[in-house]
Design a protein with these regions (language model features):
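Structural motif
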Residues: 11-13, 114, 145-147, 176, ...
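Conserved phosphate/ATP/ADP-binding segment of small-molecule kinases
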Residues: 153-248
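Conserved small/polar residues in nucleotide/adenosyl-binding loops
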Residues: 288-289
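Conserved phosphate-binding/catalytic loop of the ribokinase/pfkB sugar-kinase fold
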Residues: 91-97, 104-140
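Short acidic, glycine-rich surface-loop motifs adjacent to enzyme active sites
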Residues: 143-155
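Short pre-catalytic strand/loop immediately N-terminal to key active-site residues, enriched for Gly-Thr
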Residues: 41-45, 252-262
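Positively charged, low-complexity intrinsically disordered leader regions
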Residues: 1-27
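Substrate-binding N-lobe of the ribokinase-like
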Residues: 8, 31, 35-101
Length: 290
């Protein structure tokens, strides 16, 4: 099954960001304020957000194609160089807003602080919106599946999501969505959405406990309300639940010690996209083994 994944073309549209890490040691407290002084010994950058989905797809042997926005700045140039080095095809359009950047300072293997560089509630103007949609429509004929990676930073607005879903359906392409927020009207008629338990509770308006029956009940309500084909609910240590009108399955996980959960949702959606692009049925997908 893994061999069938290799070479599958996956279109990823969403909010890309740069994750920067400063790693060092803490041996004293600052005399200026009661905070640790981190002596930095190493700094590195990682593709984040929708770009991390693409990086995961590449690791699985797929051929990702990214459509997104970048700031016309140093961090934007850094991201473009990283895409080029990895061989990830892309159409990245510049905006007047800075490239979304998350900077983490790690001292003695513990995160000390995270600095977020971004613009609140970035709204797309019509020109940029149309550029994104035109890029998607150009890419659609050659890809096997579509991922919308919504981090709530502006790329995945109502118009973009609905037009991507509609255009994909018109060409028989499945659309997988990693959602953000409770406005799921923009995801109407998607193939599969991958909320975590907290997101499922929020969008359903129910206090959903991490129990099979409660999750299935809430998910079935959402499927009907938004005309969705299926949901894959991630449930932390209890694994995942796949819910569709004609078939449902609870997929357990293997217990492992976890040091860092950041990017876990990106890994889920990338693995799911790769499997579906290869024609592997949901019921046959074991995320632990993939």
């Amino acid at each position: 099954e893994l061999n069938s994944i290799k070479g599958k073309k996956v279109l990823v549209i969403g909010d890309v960001m740069l994750d920067t890490y400063h790693i060092g040691n803490v041996k004293r407290i600052s005399p200026e304020a009661p905070v640790p002084v981190v002596r930095v010994t190493r700094t590195y950058n990682v593709l984040g957000g929708a770009a991390n989905v693409a990086r995961n797809l590449l690791g699985l042997g797929c051929s990702p194609y990214v459509v997104s926005l970048l700031g016309n700045d140093h961090n934007g140039n850094t991201m473009q160089e990283m895409f080029a080095d990895l061989g990830i095809r892309n159409e990245l359009f510049h905006t007047e807003h800075p490239t979304i950047t998350k900077t983490r300072v790690i001292g003695n293997s513990q995160q000390v602080v995270r600095l977020d560089f971004e613009t609140e509630n970035e709204c797309l103007n019509e020109e940029i919106e149309q550029k994104l949609l035109d890029a998607v429509k150009r890419a659609l004929p050659e890809v096997d599946i579509v991922v919308i990676s919504d981090y709530g930073k502006g790329v995945c607005n109502d118009t973009v999501c609905q037009q991507v879903i509609s255009a994909s359906a018109g060409q028989g392409k499945k659309v997988i969505i990693d959602p953000k927020g409770t406005n799921w009207e923009k995801y109407r008629s998607a193939t599969i959405i991958t909320p975590n338990l907290k997101e499922l509770s929020a969008v359903s308006g129910m206090d959903v406990r991490n129990e099979d029956k409660e999750i299935h009940n809430a998910a079935n309500r959402i499927l009907k309300e938004y005309n969705l084909t299926s949901l894959l609910v991630t449930r932390s240590e209890k694994g995942m639940s796949y819910i569709a009108p004609d078939a449902s399955q609870d997929i357990p996980t293997e217990a492992r010690e976890v040091y860092d959960v950041s990017g876990a949702g990106d890994t889920v959606v990338a693995t799911l996209a790769a499997a579906l692009a290869a024609g592997i049925p949901i019921a046959a997908v074991s995320y632990t083994h993939l």
